[in-house]
Swiss-Prot record:
Its EC number is 3.4.22.-. One of its GO terms (molecular function) is cysteine-type endopeptidase activity. This is Oryzain beta chain. Expressed only in seeds. Glycans are attached at residues 341, 389. It comes from Oryza sativa subsp. japonica.
C-alpha cells in the first residue's frame, strides 16, 4: 500500500513538473505492436489514469484533441508516453542526461505530433547559401552568449495547430535585430506572414521558409505589429490595410555558411539567428529540461531561433527558442548539443541558418488601422405561417387555440419546432417527449415511460396584417 502511494505521488509530481515542458525524438510510432509492448511495464493502469486526470486538469480539460469518443484512445496514447518518459528519466538520472516530461503533447502519437506542429519547408532555399557572410573574419568569440539577458528576445509565443514555425522563427529574429539597432522591443505579426507572404515556398499553415519570409518583409517595406495584426493560427485572406502598416523594416538578410557550427556561432555571437532543425522525434516532442542529446536526423522540418550558446558541466550547447508556448521544455526553450563533431550540427541546426540585417531607423509610424467593418447579421428566419390570418415565429409550432368543427379560428404558438399540440388547447410537448398528460401538466417520452418533463405553454399567434 505504501509503495503504491509513493508511486502515485511520483506520477503526480511528474505530471505537475511537466506542465512547463515536452516533445520527443525517437520516431517510434504508436501502433498496435508498440502499444502492446509498452503496456507490459511501467506505471499501472490505475496510476496512469490518475496521472491522466491531473494532466487533463493542467491542460484546461484536454489537449488540442477532441476527447468525446476519443477519450479512451487518448488515454492509451498518454499511458504509452508516460511509460516512455518514466523509463527515459530513470536512465537519465543515472547518467545525468536530459529529462522528458508529460507536456501538452503527451496524448499525441508521434505521427499526430509531426503532422500538426511542424512546418519548415527545406527542399531548397530561394537563393544559394553563403553568398554573403559579414562575420566570416571574426575569430575571437565570447565563451557564452544569451540574448535573452540583453532584452533582445521577445517572450515565447505559441504557433498552435498550424505549421507556421517558419513565420515565428523569422519574426523573432526581426524583433531581435530591431531591438539591437533601435533599442525598442516591438512584437511583430506572424499572421501577416501566414496570410500575406505567399512568395517562394511559403504557404501559411502548410509550411514555409524563413528566407522567403525575410524577402517578403524587405519587398513589403516592413511588417506590422502583433497587436494590430494578431495571430489566429489559421490561414486567411491577407488584410491589405494591415499589410500596409509597415512598423519595423529590415535592410536584407544573410545565410550562414552551411554545415559549419563555427560560422553559426559567429553569427549567434552578434544576434539571434533563424535555424531549421529536425524536431519530429519522440524525445523532442516530450523534452523537458537539460542539454538535449536525443536521437534526431537532418530531415529539417521545424523553424526555430538560436538565441545563444554556452557550456554546462563540459557539455557545449545552443540555446534555442521554440514556438510551442512557455509550457514546453525550459520555459519554451531547448538547450541542444553543440560541437558534436558532425558538420550538420545537432538535428541539422547548422544546415540552414540565416539572419536579417538592419542598420537604420524604421519607417514613419503608420496611422491607426481602420477597424474592419462588422459582419452584417444574417437575415432573420421567416415566420411560420399558420393560415392566411395567423403566423408564429420561426422555430415554433402552430397549435390551434380555438376551433369550430374542422376550422381553426384562433392559433397559438408552441415555443419549439415539431411540437405536439395538446388537446387542452393551452399546452404542448417537445418532440423528444411527445405524449401529453394534460391533467398532470407533463409530457412523456412514450405512453408508459416514467420519463417526463413539464409541458410547455403556448402563446397567442401573431395576426397577419399585410
Amino acid at each position: 500500500m505504501a509503495a503504491r502511494a509513493a508511486a502515485a505521488a511520483f506520477l503526480l509530481l511528474l505530471i505537475v513538473g511537466a506542465a512547463t515542458a515536452a516533445p520527443d525524438m525517437s520516431i517510434i510510432s504508436y501502433n498496435a505492436e508498440h502499444g502492446a509492448r509498452g503496456l507490459e511495464e511501467g506505471p499501472t493502469e490505475a496510476e496512469a489514469r490518475a496521472a491522466y486526470d491531473l494532466w487533463l486538469a493542467e491542460n484546461g480539460g484536454g489537449s488540442p484533441n477532441a476527447l468525446g469518443g476519443e477519450h479512451e484512445r487518448r488515454f492509451l496514447v498518454f499511458w504509452d508516453n508516460l511509460k516512455f518518459v518514466d523509463a527515459h528519466n530513470a536512465r537519465a538520472d543515472e547518467r545525468g542526461g536530459f529529462r522528458l516530461g508529460m507536456n501538452r503533447f503527451a496524448d499525441l502519437t508521434n505521427e499526430e505530433f509531426r503532422a500538426t506542429f511542424l512546418g519548415a519547408k527545406v527542399a531548397e532555399r530561394s537563393r544559394a547559401a553563403g553568398e554573403r557572410y559579414r562575420h566570416d573574419g571574426v575569430e575571437e568569440l565570447p565563451e557564452s552568449v544569451d540574448w535573452r539577458e540583453k532584452g533582445a528576445v521577445a517572450p515565447v509565443k505559441n504557433q498552435g495547430q498550424c505549421g507556421s514555425c517558419w513565420a515565428f522563427s523569422a519574426v523573432s529574429t526581426v524583433e531581435s535585430i530591431n531591438q539591437l539597432v533601435t533599442g525598442e522591443m516591438i512584437t511583430l505579426s506572424e499572421q501577416e506572414l501566414v496570410e500575406c507572404s505567399t512568395n517562394g515556398q511559403n504557404s501559411g499553415c502548410n509550411g514555409g521558409l524563413m528566407d522567403d519570409a525575410f524577402d517578403f518583409i524587405i519587398k513589403n517595406g516592413g511588417i506590422d505589429t502583433e497587436d494590430d495584426y494578431p495571430y489566429k493560427a489559421v490561414d486567411g485572406k491577407c488584410d491589405i490595410n494591415r499589410e500596409n502598416a509597415k512598423v519595423v523594416s529590415i535592410d536584407g538578410f544573410e545565410d550562414v555558411p552551411q554545415n559549419d557550427e563555427k560560422s553559426l556561432q559567429k553569427a549567434v555571437a552578434h544576434q539571434p539567428v533563424s535555424v531549421a532543425i529536425e524536431a519530429g522525434g519522440r524525445e523532442f516532442q516530450l523534452y523537458h529540461s537539460g542539454v538535449f542529446s536525443g536521437r534526431c536526423g537532418t530531415s529539417l522540418d521545424h523553424g526555430v531561433v538560436a538565441v545563444g550558446y554556452g557550456t554546462d558541466n563540459g557539455k557545449d550547447y545552443w540555446i534555442v527558442r521554440n514556438s510551442w508556448g512557455p509550457k514546453w521544455g525550459e520555459s519554451g526553450y531547448v538547450r541542444m548539443e553543440r560541437n558534436i563533431n558532425v558538420t550538420t550540427g545537432k538535428c541539422g541546426i547548422a544546415m540552414m541558418a540565416s539572419y536579417p540585417t538592419k542598420s537604420g531607423a524604421n519607417p514613419p509610424k503608420p496611422s491607426p488601422t481602420p477597424p474592419t467593418p462588422p459582419t452584417p447579421p444574417p437575415p432573420s428566419a421567416p415566420d411560420h405561417v399558420c393560415d392566411d390570418n395567423f403566423s408564429c415565429p420561426a422555430g415554433s409550432t402552430c397549435c390551434c387555440a380555438f376551433g369550430f368543427r374542422n376550422l381553426c379560428l384562433v392559433w397559438g404558438c408552441c415555443p419549439v419546432e415539431g411540437a405536439t399540440c395538446c388537446k387542452d388547447h393551452a399546452s404542448c410537448c417537445p418532440p423528444d417527449y411527445p405524449v401529453c398528460n394534460t391533467r398532470a401538466g407533463t409530457c412523456s417520452a412514450s405512453k408508459n415511460s416514467p420519463l417526463s418533463v413539464k409541458a410547455l405553454k403556448r402563446t397567442l399567434a401573431k395576426l397577419n396584417t399585410a
